[in-house]
Amino acid sequence: MEEVDRILIHSLRSCGTEVPEDIQSIRQFNTELIVEAVVRCLRVINPSLGATLSHVLPPGMSAQFRIGTSLAQACQDLGYSSEVGYQTFLYSSEPDIRALLIFLAEKLPRDSSEDAHQPAGKSALLQREIVATIKQQLSLPWLPLSCRIAALRRSQSSCRLHRFHSQPLSLASDPALKSIPNERKEYWQRYLPSVTSQLPHLPSVAASLLERNTSKLSAVQEWEAEWKSQGLASRLSPEDYRSKKQQRLQKRIQEQLRQCAQLLAENHLPSSSSQDLTDMLRAFNLDGGSDQKKGSRFTRTQRFTYQQDPHTLKEQMQRAAEILPKKDAQDADAEQQEISSLQEQIDSIEQEIRGLSESNKLLQLTIGQVEGEVNDMHQSCEEKANVVRVKKRAVELLPDADNNLDKLQTLVDASAQRMANLIGQWESHQARLSDEYMELNRVQQEQEDESSRWMKDAKDLYEKIQGSADEAKRKEELYKQLLSEYESLPKEVSRAAYTQRILEIVSNIKKQKEEITKILSDTKELQKEINNLTGKVDRTFVVTDELVFKDAKKDEPVRKAYKYLAALHENCSQLIQTIEDTGTILREIRDLEEQIETETTKKTLSNLQKILEDYRAIKQENAQLLARTREA
């Protein structure tokens, strides 16, 4: 029990219970220490349950009874099945308190906050450091600004707080990837600014990095989930699956843009929106290049000129504004007038461009209608030409109609004969091809089944690989966490002493098991020998009784001997029964001695004295209350 008590005391100290160093056993716990230990454990196990309980025993007896009842109810709510009440805490016994503390110690969360089977690695250590820092800061009293020292000004001031505002960042990818162009790698190495230089405000660096990291992690998780659910079933490589997905997405965007363009055209909305959609459709290659194929050389040259000059003028204006140095006020006014005139020219040119684009659209619609009419006319001309060709052939055959009919009949008969031969050949080929088709279909089905089985095996293998990777990652984090905890432990503790103590305990347990096994085997042998002797005595008495009884009918001395034999057997039976009763009494005596020792450990006399003292204290409190009531 000493080792158990030491482990319990260590667990109670880790929960915050102030157990004195001189206490080494549960037997030395008093009522105040028991109440504090139970309340501390309840607060760690269930903070909402232990928050309403005080770990300090109040002086009044009624308050002590109430807190004892509350503690008993809290332990029962946690699932403690043994009998517990206020007397367990106020008039405690060593076995009951030890059983209750063992139950609470088993309910404590491992590592005081986490389960050892769910390590969190660096994140757990970071959270612990954050919690420790926050607790340390909360433990400091709040002081006015004029009374704070430098450290308190930094910790209790709100000037270092900033809003979580993230901005997009440009970061370099892995340079080992082959798909990245060399120009981009050179840009990353020479010209890409640092993260702190990309943002206008330094406090937004952490928020931007966290946002980018979170978006990357979520994208990776979404891709893994999609690849497990749909990618493996498509039997495509990851690159092909991504390209197919991109094509499907592009087609959907194209259909949506086409529908929006049609709605704008049907509702006669402003031309600017329709023009924007048309340009976007051209970017997706939806217009089929009709605008580029149609139109004269003059219209294409004019469109190019009027669409390019305004941008060129704007770029030239921006360059001129950047290159020209600052001049005096008169030169600035002249430049401003020139810029305004150029802006007016640009506006007029843009207006002309919009008018020309509208006229171009009308011309394109007209050209489309004319092309449709031309195609219809070409189709009708081809149909009429076919009819004329047939009629011309018939007119050429009319002069020699009889011979032509005979020739035609001969051709028909030959065609019929050839058709019959072809049908026979086709039937033979059809049977052979049908067999080949059935065989190929069977082979294909087997291959599909084999492919499905391989796909299922690949998916299971992929899941096993993922599970192994997760398990390896979890074990690596657990290793790092245990290593950090080991490094944080005090180095003066001798590991060899604990190991030697554990080995001694194991050897003692082994010796006890050997002794118990030896005692059990001796008991079995003794019981077997007693049973053999009892059976032998019974058999001997039966045989002797039969032999003596036969001679007792004829001889008087033998009759006396038979009576003595019966009396001897009865006395031996009484002696054996007396021995058995003596053994039973001895066992009962040992049980009673153990019960006496158990009752002695329960401190019955001291508890009775304490109960009497509490009873007198309650009577005194009641008398004081009655006196106050009468005075009131």
Curated annotation (Swiss-Prot):
GO BP terms in the entry: positive regulation of ubiquitin-dependent protein catabolic process; protein transport
One Pfam family linked to the record: CCDC22_N
Plastid in keyword set: no
Parts forming coiled coils: 243-269, 326-367, 400-540, 584-628
Record-level GO cellular component terms: centrosome; endosome
Subcellular location: Endosome; Cytoplasm, Cytoskeleton, Microtubule organizing center, Centrosome
Main location: other
InterPro entries: CCDC22, CCDC22_CC, CCDC22_N
Keywords: Coiled coil, Cytoplasm, Cytoskeleton, Endosome, Protein transport, Transport, Ubl conjugation pathway
GO molecular function: cullin family protein binding
Family per similarity comment: Belongs to the CCDC22 family.
Role, per record: May be involved in regulation of NF-kappa-B signaling. May be involved in copper-dependent atp7a trafficking between the trans-Golgi network and vesicles in the cell periphery.
Name recorded for this polypeptide: Coiled-coil domain-containing protein 22
Organism: Xenopus laevis (African clawed frog)
Higher taxonomy: Eukaryota, Metazoa, Chordata, Craniata, Vertebrata
